A protein has these predicted regions:
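Active-site gating loops and adjacent loop-to-helix segments of metal-dependent hydrolytic enzymes
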Residues: 72-106, 218, 222-248, 268-273, ...
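N-terminal metal-binding scaffold of metallo-dependent hydrolase/deaminase domains
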Residues: 1-44, 55-56
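C-terminal helical cap
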Residues: 110-117, 273, 278-283, 321-372
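Short acidic/histidine-rich active-site segments
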Residues: 215-221, 275-279, 284-286, 295-314, ...
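Metal-coordinating catalytic core of metallo-dependent amide/deamination hydrolases
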Residues: 134-257
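Alpha-helical scaffold segments that flank or form the walls of functional sites
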Residues: 76-129, 133-151, 173-180, 413-421
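C-terminal cap of metal-dependent C-N hydrolases
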Residues: 8, 352-409, 413
Length: 423
């Protein structure tokens, strides 16, 4: 089965060359796409034709670091005490909330996050999950929900020592079971300051067993570095490097805000990935990271939202403060870097047949030379008209296809009320 996008204006994601043509999109995890100006006028009845006259078509987006478990936090009751530092943000807000999550809350969080991702043109999610007292099967719950929406994914559970030995062991077991089932993902760890040497070593061994990487928050707050120096006599990145995390090409280091020169060198000379989460860092008042000297940087949202256009624009606008400035092209390339990471996993989704159809009427000329400028200054999630994931139309003219948006939102509201009553 194929999908034909007639009269589409294809924007090459590397050269930004615009070509008006018909695009043939094949369905399935291994399906492809091809520009075919001579596609037949009459298509087989099982095929679908979309008129894309005046529309831009380009690869859809991926999120390099999400927290689906936070989806029901919007508008939740305030913390019992106003946090004054990053550790208190974790203690009074996120750790207080994630301990209350159960299966239905996790499922609702994944469905509503999938809904918002899809409508924002995001067809692939790399997620970092936490639900310490409803841990067993939680990753499969998220995976099935994202599958229903039609999104590709790489999932992990953020294992830590913060809730005791039993929960730590359950986190390792959940990760091993999920990856052994054939699902693709990472071995997740929370952060150095909640991970002892035993857990760190076992996580690296588990990642090697499953030929994947470790996904961990790194020096998001200065407290992570202070704890590591006090407890282990070294920096966070040095500790991770000594344990083998940086040797794994599919490892993801989240945030990387507070790094010294040696740590930057360790990351630069490693094959691992760094993910930037600008808006979350601003929200938590932890500072701004500098990323322009790292060879592999992708963008995430850290659970703040599911809009990768917005994340790219945030990284661009803040670069003058954090990195001495960045070109629109560099910001766009950072947005697109996630695709290379996804390909390294050979995971379903994230291929050539993941596309976004944009309704963008510009008051000024849009050219091959200025496309990144338009993207950084003028594009908006409202321009996302339709979305194709693995060759299947999952958003059709602004509406989720195959699922009832109202049902998803009602379910999320129901579970949010249950969660909030426990806080």
């Amino acid at each position: 089965m194929s999908l034909y996008l007639r009269n589409a204006t294809w924007i090459d994601p590397e050269t930004f060359k615009a070509t008006t043509t018909t695009i043939k999109v094949e369905e399935g995890p291994s399906g492809g796409m091809a520009l075919d100006a001579h596609a037949p006028v009459e298509c087989p009845p099982e095929d679908t034709v979309l008129d894309c006259t005046g529309r831009l078509v380009t690869p859809s987006f991926g999120c390099g670091h999400h927290h689906i478990y936070s989806a029901l936090a919007r508008g939740m009751p305030p913390a019992p005490k106003t946090p004054t530092n990053f550790l208190e943000v974790l203690e009074y807000v996120w750790w207080r909330m994630d301990k209350k999550l159960d299966h239905d809350m996790i499922e609702a969080s994944a469905l509503v996050t999938g809904l918002y991702c899809a409508k924002n043109g995001v067809t692939f999610v790399i997620d970092h999950h936490a639900s310490p007292f409803h841990l067993d099967g939680s990753l499969e719950t998220i995976a099935k929900a994202l599958d229903r929406v039609g999104l590709g994914h790489l999932l992990c559970y953020e294992i830590s020592c913060r809730d005791g030995e039993e929960i730590k062991e359950k986190g390792l077991d959940e990760t091993d079971a999920f990856l052994s089932s054939g699902r693709k993902g990472h071995v997740g760890l929370h952060a150095s300051f909640t991970v002892d040497d035993d857990l760190l070593g076992r996580a690296v061994d588990l990642a090697r067993k499953h030929k994947t990487g470790v996904h961990i928050h790194v020096a998001e707050g200065i407290e992570d570095q202070e704890h590591c120096a006090r407890t282990y006599g070294k920096s966070v990145v040095r500790r991770l490097s000594d344990a083998g995390v940086l040797d794994l090409p599919l490892s993801i280091l989240g945030h990387c805000v507070h790094l010294d020169a040696e740590e930057r060198d360790l990351i630069r000379t490693s094959p691992c990935w760094v993910v930037q989460n600008t808006e979350s860092n601003l929200n938590n008042n932890v500072g701004l990271g500098r990323y322009n000297d790292f060879p592999r940087v992708m963008l995430g949202t850290d659970g703040m939202h599911s809009d990768m256009i917005r994340s790219a624009q945030s990284s661009y606008f803040i670069a003058g403060l954090a990195e001495g400035g960045m070109s629109p092209l560099a910001a766009y390339q950072r947005l697109r870097a996630v695709h290379a990471h996804i390909q390294g996993h050979n995971a379903p989704g994230g291929g050539a047949n993941d596309l976004v159809i944009l309704n963008y009427d510009s008051p000024t000329p849009l050219t091959q030379d200025n496309f990144p400028g338009h993207f950084c200054y003028a594009f908006d999630a409202r321009n996302v008209e339709s979305v194709i994931s693995q060759g299947r139309l999952i958003v059709d003219h602004g509406r989720l296809a195959g699922m009832d948006e109202a049902d998803i939102l009602a379910y999320a509201n129901e579970q949010a009320r249950r969660l909030w009553a426990l806080l």
